[in-house]
């Protein structure tokens, strides 16, 4: 198997694409310098995937195959929601035992609910990945360009050190994360809990599970993250909440883990907003979320029927 870094990329605007291409060029230079031992040049899907891809299912399959052929994952990760497909790729790569090294330049930190602990992006992301973070906010417009360039250089220096730690010598990957014997029929996405609409839906789902004499466990991304991942691994099926244009990054990561352990989830998505990419119509969910789910559930009645069956 080649030693190679899969570089995730938010595709939807020029700035993100250019930033990722520049990141690949920088990492490739580190490889040429011998800092990352035995590594091939980076794999960037938008640059290296096969051409003439016919549809989103092919994109999904190509990216899963590419991740399987790599040995680590890296990329920019700025923003609280970011891109759900990138979140999925992190969760899936985590199940393969890959080192995951990400860059964030946000000065925001986030906490779920009333917790006093704040994290870059999320506590879950900080558990499954190593983040290179320089959260400066320059309050002055004077010399703003130079200050931002200096911030990038500092964050790249941290990333380089993190990558050298993981790939400066040849070492085996961590064991793959597998499913565990089933103790719960369903695992409920913790992100149901953070809005009134989500809590209302979760109560209806819990009622349906109890009515079907089945069992469940609440997801919890506020406490012991590894325990929460273990509960997902002990569940027959996850039920995830993707009812916004860009689902919370934790939902994407957890769905990647569920897919990686071979238990494809139900993904709740009643949002009817759609979009065009070029001349092609798509639904509003990222293809990595769509095709890693057992089914996309569009109403609580449909979900209740699945639980009862």
Positions of predicted regions on the chain:
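Conserved catalytic or regulatory cores that recognize and/or transform ribose-phosphate-containing ligands
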Residues: 1-309
């Amino acid at each position: 198997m080649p030693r190679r870094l899969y570089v995730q990329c938010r595709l939807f605007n020029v700035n993100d694409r250019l930033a990722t291409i520049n990141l690949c060029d920088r990492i490739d230079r580190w490889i040429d310098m011998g800092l990352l031992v035995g590594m091939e040049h980076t794999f960037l899907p938008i640059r290296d995937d096969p051409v003439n891809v016919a549809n989103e299912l092919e994109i999904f399959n190509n990216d899963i195959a590419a991740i399987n052929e790599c040995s680590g994952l890296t990329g920019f990760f700025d923003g609280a929601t970011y891109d759900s497909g990138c979140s999925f790729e992190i969760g899936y790569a985590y199940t393969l035992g890959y080192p995951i090294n990400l860059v964030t330049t946000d000065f925001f930190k986030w906490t779920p609910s009333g917790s006093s602990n704040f994290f870059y992006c999320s506590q879950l992301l900080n558990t499954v990945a190593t983040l290179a973070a320089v959260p400066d906010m320059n309050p002055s417009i004077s010399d703003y360009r130079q200050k931002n360039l200096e911030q990038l250089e500092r964050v790249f220096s941290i990333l380089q050190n993190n990558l050298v730690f993981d790939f400066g010598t040849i070492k085996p990957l961590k064991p793959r994360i597998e499913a565990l014997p089933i103790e719960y029929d369903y695992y409920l996405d913790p992100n149901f809990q953070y809005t009134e609409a989500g809590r209302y839906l979760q109560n209806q789902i819990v009622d349906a599970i109890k009515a079907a004499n089945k069992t469940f466990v609440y997801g919890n991304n506020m406490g012991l993250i590894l325990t929460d991942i273990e509960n997902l691994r002990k569940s027959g099926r996850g039920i995830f909440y993707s009812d916004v244009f860009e689902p919370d990054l934790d939902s994407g990561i957890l769905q990647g883990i569920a897919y990686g352990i071979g238990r494809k989830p139900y993904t709740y998505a009643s949002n009817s907003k759609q979009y065009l990419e070029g001349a092609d119509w798509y639904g509003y969910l990222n293809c990595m979320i769509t095709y890693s789910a057992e089914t996309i559930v569009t109403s609580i009645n449909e979900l209740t029927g699945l639980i009862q069956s």
